[in-house]
């Protein structure tokens, strides 16, 4: 259905959890995903499969083109931007060793087979801009956009949209709701996302909330 409408592929949530009680290495899950990949190659060869799996040697063996590094499990990804003492923080107290060890092993196990994705964030964690200014974010993006693999930008991160702490939980989002506010396209009612002055998840009410239109006009902006 979605592919016939023009979608370019699927980002599969919890891709490693489809088969319950699978054996170590998830062989049953891998076989099932291989069947789906074979269907795509036959019917929609232009489409891509991206997995929320976190073990690229398994997910790519299962037919996915790309796999995300995740914010749960080993602390490799969280040690970069989040966690108690992230590497990309002004204080300079972080340690990148765990990330490098994990990423190097992932890269070696998938060389020539598929891509590892380091996301700027997602809907389940505080935004990258939390606790950082635009200079900090430029350094983060210089890293993300030059590492091997395929970088993924969570919507709004490209303009430094802020994490909105303390807003009401929506749809069981709890603290995660603060990373799910509407995209801020331009400085007018509804930020160009809607013509309404209110939205299901609140807007950033800050006077200096970043917008796409303003950043595109500024040669020194994060955009």
Give the ranges of each region predicted by the language model:
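Alpha-amylase-like alpha-glycosidases and glucanotransferases acting on alpha-linked glucans and related
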Residues: 1-22, 30-149, 206-207
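Metal-dependent catalytic neighborhoods of phosphoester/phosphodiester hydrolases
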Residues: 26
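Loop/helix patches that line or flank the sugar-binding groove of alpha-linked glycan CAZymes
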Residues: 41-43, 63, 71, 98-101, ...
